[in-house]
């Protein structure tokens, strides 16, 4: 059986990157929540 996680930098950035998070209202909510929590890294 093939492993499920096959890393790819491109796909990682396109699906979980900062700019993608900024696009939608929900994504911005995620970033704000992470800021409030004091996360060092907001997005990938």
Curated annotation (Swiss-Prot):
Which organism is the protein's source?
A: Bordetella avium (strain 197N)
User: What is this protein's name?
Assistant: Large ribosomal subunit protein bL34
By its UniProt entry, which InterPro entries does this protein fall under?
Ribosomal_bL34, Ribosomal_bL34_CS
A single GO cellular-component term on record: ribosome
GO MF assignments: structural constituent of ribosome
Give the gene that encodes this protein: rpmH
BP-aspect Gene Ontology terms = translation
The UniProt entry, under NCBIfam families, shows:
rpmH_bact (TIGR01030)
Q: Which family does it belong to?
A: Belongs to the bacterial ribosomal protein bL34 family.
At the top level, the lineage of the source is Bacteria
The record's Pfam families line, in alphabetical order, gives:
Ribosomal_L34
Alphabetically sorted, this entry's keywords are: Ribonucleoprotein, Ribosomal protein
């Amino acid at each position: 059986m093939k492993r499920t996680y096959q890393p790819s930098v491109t796909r990682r950035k396109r699906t979980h990157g900062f700019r993608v998070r900024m696009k939608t209202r929900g994504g911005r909510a995620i970033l704000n929540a992470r800021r409030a929590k004091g996360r060092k890294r907001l997005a990938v």
